Amino acid sequence: SMELLADIGKNTVDFVPNFDDTEKEPVVLPSRYPNLLVNGTTGIAVGMATNIPPHNLREVVQAVVKIIDNRVEEDRDTTIDEILPIVKAPDFPTGGLILGTRGCEEAYRTGRGKIRVRAVTNIETLPNGKSQIIATELPYMVNKANLIIKIAELVKLKKIDGITDIRDESNREGVRVVIELRKDANANVILNQLYKHTQLQDTFGVIMLALINNQPKVMNLLDMLTYYLKHQEDVVTRRTKYDLNKAEERDHILQGLLKALDFIDEVITIIRGSQNAQIAKERLMERFELSDVQAQAIVDMRLRALTGLEREKLENEHQDLVAKIAELKAILADEKLLLGVIKTEMSAIAEKYGDDRRSKIGYDELDISMEDLIPRENTIIAMTSLGYIKRMTVDNFKAQNRGGRGIKGMQTIDEDYIEDLLMTTTHHYLNFFTNMGRVYLSLIHISEPTRRS
C-alpha cells in the first residue's frame, strides 16, 4: 500500500478539495505498479460496470518492461501479440484452475470476455473402498459456506446422487472441503455434476472499463498498460522536477554558507553589530552579494552553529548536489533515461513483492478445434460433373515421364467425368453452395477412399 502512495508529497499528482472543502485529496495515486491490473477491481455505476480480474505482479511488470524496451531499444510501439505470451491469464489470490486461454485472450484483445475457473480437486480412495472428493482451491469470489449449502440442497433434491457427507476441514494452512461418496458411486461422474450445477466451476466476466480523462472507456490489455506507462511518465517527470528544484535550492544555500565561511569573522561581526535580523540580512546581502534566501539562512543559524560549520562537509554536499542536479536535468531532457528510471523502479517492486502464480492454466475442451485433431497434409479434391467428390493424397500421384503408362486416379460412373480438380490441405475449408442459395462450410477432411474407387 505504501508503494501506491510513494512520492505523493513531491507534487507527483494533482489534488482537489474533498467533499466538504475542508481538506484536499489526490485525483489519482502515484502508484509505482499497475494496481488496477494487479489487484483488480469491481464496480457498478449508472449504465456501466467494470470487472477487472487480479493479475500476477511479476507478469504485469514484465509486460510494462517489454513496452519500455521496445520504445528504448527499437523505437517502436508494442503489439498485443507481444503482450499475450507474457500475461496469459489472470492470477486469482484463491488459486483455482483457469480453463483454457481462449476467454482470456478475447478479454485481453477486446476488453470483454468470460473466463471459466474451476476448483482444484482430487479424488482419494479410502481403505474401506469408498471415495471422496477433496477441493483445496475454490474459484475467485466463491463463498465456501454458500457452496456447501448448495451441494447439500442438490443432494436433498436428488439432483446429485451418491454423496453421503460434506465436511469443511479448512484451517490456517488452506481450504479443504471434503465430499464423501457412496461405495458404488462414480467419483468422476459426480465431480462433473458438481462442476455443472455448483460454483466448483464458475465464470468470471471481464469488463476492463476505466476512466480516461474523466471519460469511461473499455480497453484491451495493451491499452491499460500503455495508459499506465503514460501515467508513470507524468509522475516521474513531476517528481524529478520537484527533486531538481529542491536540490537547486539547497545548493544555492550551500554556496552562500561556503562564502560565509570564507569571511566567517566579518560575518559574525556584522550579525553582532546589527540591531535586528532584518538589518543583519541586508548588510550581509550588500557586503557579500548574497541572495535573500542565502542571507536568511545565515541569519537563522545560531552563531555557535555558524562557527562550527565544517567546510569539507559542506563542499562534499555541494559536489553531491551538483552531480545530482546534472543527473536530474539529464532525465528531464532524455525520454529514454526517463523510461529507464521507470523500468528500474518497477523491476525493484516486482523483485521485492512478486511471487509465483497461484492460478494454474489448464486445457479447455473448447480450446481444442477440429484442426488440432486432423493431421495437416497436402491433398487433392476432385469433383465430377454428376456431383461426386473424392479426396486423394498427393502421394497417390507421380509425374509421368516420357512414354510409359499413367496411373488411374479414380473410377467414374458411365458418362461421368472429372469437372474440377484442386490442390489444397486438410486444414483448409471447403464451401458447398446449394441450388437453394445456402452455403455450408466444412474442413477438407472428406473420408479418403482407395485410389481406384
List the predicted regions and their residue ranges.
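Short glycine/proline-enriched loop/turn "hinge" motifs that connect secondary-structure elements
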Residues: 35-37, 169
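Intrinsically disordered, low-complexity linker/assembly segments
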Residues: 30, 38-39, 208
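C-terminal interaction appendages of subunits in large macromolecular complexes
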Residues: 3, 8-11, 42, 48-447, ...
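P-loop NTPase nucleotide-binding/switch module
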Residues: 4-32
